[in-house]
């Protein structure tokens, strides 16, 4: 029973870490990457849709990203979505393709991005701690109902803490790597 709770918690924490990784890949570092804009949602046919579902995104060189929609009618919607995003990019629409110039980051913008990284990292850690809390509550209910012993509760609690510490360490490493990438000039 405890193993099921631990496995469920581990899956949830792993999913949370995957979301963090996806969010961090979308934070601008001064180099072009399709991941920078893939997550941006465009209002298309009344439904928020990720750009990568509407267009081909490529990075032909380190300073440009090109977005070529499969349906030209969504060009202006993609352009608006990029302008609304917190990336600070100005799209250049030529009627067929949207080009994004990726300027080098100013020191001020680097600091803003580092704050965003730290904010997302903290949100992820909170989510992991909430998973831990929920799992602990489940185990305590089982102990109260006399389905597991106090020793089992203690062992499960210790294992859960190790799992949580492991995932938080992984999240910290992702955050530190992204911060180091942002600090490179």
Curated annotation (Swiss-Prot):
One Pfam family, short name: RRF
Keyword tRNA processing attributed: no
GO biological process assignments: translational termination
Primary subcellular site in the record, as a coarse category: cytoplasm
Location in or out of the cell: Cytoplasm
GO molecular function terms attached to this record: ribosomal large subunit binding
Function: Responsible for the release of ribosomes from messenger RNA at the termination of protein biosynthesis. May increase the efficiency of translation by recycling ribosomes from one round of translation to another.
Entry keywords, A to Z: Cytoplasm, Protein biosynthesis
Keyword hit for Protein biosynthesis: yes
GO cellular component terms listed in the entry, alphabetical order: cytoplasm
Source organism: Dehalococcoides mccartyi (strain CBDB1)
Family listed: Belongs to the RRF family.
Protein name: Ribosome-recycling factor
Record lineage: Bacteria, Bacillati, Chloroflexota, Dehalococcoidia, Dehalococcoidales
